[in-house]
Amino acid sequence: MSFLRPTLALLAVTALVTTSAQLNGYSKKEVTPEDTELLQKAQSNVSAYNSDVTSRICYLKVDSLETQVVSGENYKFHVSGCSVNSDKELGGCANQNCESSKYDIVIYSQSWTNTLKVTSITPAN
């Protein structure tokens, strides 16, 4: 029975480290249709943009997604997209032949308060 103690201790530490990483940092997530719908809903609604978000883009494709648990959830979408000139062009790109670049779009969601905010749009590194 004493041989189980080190194994159980290791499992407990591993669970604690994993939980801490998910609460404090971003974790990769498989993109689902629901995630893409959340991106479209927030990114196409200019009133959902924080006042300091001045970039305006449409997205062609979601390349990957990371999430972070906070007082809700941050979604960091890595997308291919194009700069646009009007708020009517936000969301999915109507012009699939635009000159695209890579962007990171961070959306904050808190489902129990119906909060959905675009907190940043930055060129990807």
From Swiss-Prot:
Keyword Signal recorded: yes
PROSITE patterns, alphabetized: CYSTATIN
Glycan attachment positions: 45
Keyword Protease: no
GO cellular component: extracellular region
Record site: Reactive site: 25
Secretion signal, residue range per the UniProt entry: 1-21
Role description: Secreted effector that interacts with and inhibits the pathogenesis-related papain-like cysteine proteases C14, PIP1 and RCR3 of host plants. Inhibition of host proteases by a pathogen extracellular protease inhibitor forms a specific type of defense-counterdefense mechanism between plants and microbial pathogens.
UniProt record similarity statement: Belongs to the cystatin family.
Complex formation: Interacts with the host papain-like cysteine protease PIP1. Interacts with the host papain-like cysteine protease RCR3. Interacts with the host papain-like cysteine protease C14.
Protein name per its UniProtKB record: Cystatin-like cysteine protease inhibitor EPIC2B
Organism: Phytophthora infestans (strain T30-4)
